[in-house]
Amino acid sequence: MVSLVLADTADSSDLSKAAITVEESTSAQQPKFFNYHEFVITKYRALDEESCEEHGPENPICITHFPNIYVPEESDEFRTTRVVRIPRRFESSTEFPNFSTQLPGSEPAALPDTHNKEFVPAGEFEGQWYGETSVSPLSNYLDQAEWTEIVTRINSLLEAAYNPITRRNFVNVILDLLTLNLWSIIEPYLFVNPLQSVEDYVSEINRSESFRLKGIKIIPPRESSYLSVCIDSPAWIKPCTAINEPLLTHCDTLIVLL
């Protein structure tokens, strides 16, 4: 990052007389990446409380999982699943979608964690449990190595699919010219879209024994317009009024890549 500093001059309106110095920012001043999907709230029901109370900015909880918008709102799956959203990394590439390989809570600017990267409920908000840190329920199902392997593969498939310099694209351009753009209408019905490789890989992961046993799945990125990766996971449900029930209610899990 570069900052410009204007020194005092006799005539401040005359910028040509202003002395401009360039100061290189230190690494500590550089922007740090965080999961921009998450946010904090201060009014919630803590574990030892019977009603929702205001806790102030010193004791917030972090919203790290969200309603499953990929199923009908009136369905059982909507009630029993939640979505963990994984953000894009625009500093890595703007030419094609590139998603974060870091589990929520592991990002440089994540809210600090003292529970060894495990999701630990601290408060209830709108019938769902949330923790005090950026760690999401996803960390209770996948470790960093597993997640990195999955997202790295997705990113590499997306890079290959969005690469404009390929033999297929070259042939398509020639045929479009020869057929007055009719080829671009016919071609999708004759050949598989390169992005289908991403969908096939996601389907393969969702069918894996590990994902089936854990009750989690990746939402195909196409459903989120490649804006994020979403994970479908079990809901962490506990109504405000049910303070004597078990801490967690286990349901099907949703993992989404956004």
Swiss-Prot record:
Pfam families: Erf4 (PF10256). Keywords: Endoplasmic reticulum, Membrane. InterPro entries: Golgin_A_7/ERF4, Ras_palmitoyltransferase. Transmembrane segments: none annotated. Its main location: endoplasmic reticulum. It is a peripheral membrane protein. The keyword Cell membrane does not apply. It comes from the Eukaryota. One of its GO terms (cellular component) is endoplasmic reticulum palmitoyltransferase complex. It is found in: Endoplasmic reticulum membrane. GO terms for biological process: protein targeting to membrane. The ERF2-ERF4 complex is a palmitoyltransferase specific for Ras proteins. Palmitoylates RAS2, which is required for its proper plasma membrane localization. Belongs to the ERF4 family. Interacts with ERF2. This is Ras modification protein ERF4.
